[in-house]
């Protein structure tokens, strides 16, 4: 495996691409072979991203009562989870949280709302006002995760200063009907294209541990590569009581690290950020995400679950011999 990995890494650095067959071999790696896979992923991260780790924080700006039936989600109105339910926060509240994120070293701050899409009118106008104020009063790059997107809304977000639009595909097309039935995969793909056409960067990735096969993890990665995504968030399922996936078994740490490595090989020059489920899935192996190829991580709290202390995450970065970036 060592010689194969050396050849693959050299070819990628010279402008080549990981093939589907090579992707399958990475997903089959274990033991010492996985060590070589991770070493190659680390070399690619160092080559394309250096030693800087991007820190991302989010605000749950509107929670619960979502009409979508995503089988993993605490905020779906189809399930009884006890997750917080509240309307859109005011622009002032969102800006205050962005300023706090700025002071704590975040390079990106995401405004995240529940629901299939942002409501036109007062709801959208409040978000646009928050984006404009964040651009004027902080050093961070604001992003938005507001669900499905049309061209008019995308242009308004871009004009207000939204740097990045976040919209996960969640899983491979072939597995998506097992996870969500209230909208079509093509709607997600169109949202990505609309955001890019409006001039925003796109942050788009997936959630792993939903019951998908290794082949479907590769399928999703190939889709993201073809979409020319700017940054890739990798999430791992943190099972939520009350959802259909409440009893799902979290991925083993080495399996999760293998996914991170695969995506670094597939998209060597893109930011790969490890987000939700990091603690539950990786446990004592959280610092290994950088050896597996990750160049960023979400810090602070997630949408409906608590994250680690920021000081612990920053220490993890510096203990790995890396630095954390500002915008």
Curated annotation (Swiss-Prot):
Cofactor: [4Fe-4S] cluster; [2Fe-2S] cluster
Keyword Ribosomal protein in annotation: no
Domain named Radical SAM core: residues: 48-278
GO biological process: biotin biosynthetic process
Record: residues binding [2Fe-2S] cluster: 143, 203
Family annotation (Gene3D superfamilies): Aldolase class I
Catalyzed reaction equations: (4R,5S)-dethiobiotin + (sulfur carrier)-SH + 2 reduced [2Fe-2S]-[ferredoxin] + 2 S-adenosyl-L-methionine = (sulfur carrier)-H + biotin + 2 5'-deoxyadenosine + 2 L-methionine + 2 oxidized [2Fe-2S]-[ferredoxin]
Protein name per Swiss-Prot or TrEMBL: Biotin synthase
Matching HAMAP family: BioB
Note on how the cofactor is bound: Binds 1 [4Fe-4S] cluster. The cluster is coordinated with 3 cysteines and an exchangeable S-adenosyl-L-methionine.
Complex formation: Homodimer.
Enzyme Commission number, as recorded: 2.8.1.6
